A protein has these predicted regions:
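Active-site loop segments of alpha/beta catalytic cores
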Residues: 1-147
Length: 147
């Protein structure tokens, strides 16, 4: 852990350079960062990061982040793989998946569904299946509602 000032002085210029290089090559800059990055998310966006992963559910307020940044960055929005997916019921996973879609998806796009990190080996297959099926069916239903 380090202060925002150290991040801005030491690391941000490197992210700006990486983002510029990616954009010069015609590709988006995707970035993964675990933990609570709310205080430096504006910096990442200003640096040119196009896609951020995962907006970790136990570390940040997903609803506030989605509302504030929805037209500024694309979210590689992650289902909670630490608690919900491995320990929740199938219905919990279905509800959590719908909430994730409702939180991050909007008419202009800006949401790619994923896991918030690696799926734990002890995760019940029924939960993984419920997550993927719900993401596909509810996500499709949501997209069709925008037309």
């Amino acid at each position: 852990m380090f202060s925002k000032e150290i991040f801005r002085d030491m690391f941000l210029p490197l992210y700006e350079e990486l983002a510029a290089h990616c954009h010069n090559m015609g590709v988006d800059f995707w970035f993964h960062c675990c933990g609570a990055i709310t205080d430096i998310l504006d910096d990442f966006i200003a640096a040119g990061i196009d896609v951020i992963h995962p907006i970790q559910p136990i570390a940040m307020d997903q609803q506030k982040i989605a509302k504030k940044y929805r037209n500024k960055i694309t979210f590689l929005a992650g289902i909670d793989v630490q608690y919900l997916l491995p320990r929740g019921s199938v219905q919990d996973v279905i509800n959590g998946t719908k909430k994730l879609i409702d939180t991050f998806d909007h008419e202009e796009g800006g949401c790619i569904l994923a896991a918030s990190n690696g799926i734990m080996p002890e995760t019940p297959l029924e939960n993984i299946e419920a997550w993927l099926k719900t993401a596909e069916s509810y996500g499709r239903e949501k997209r069709l509602s925008y037309k």
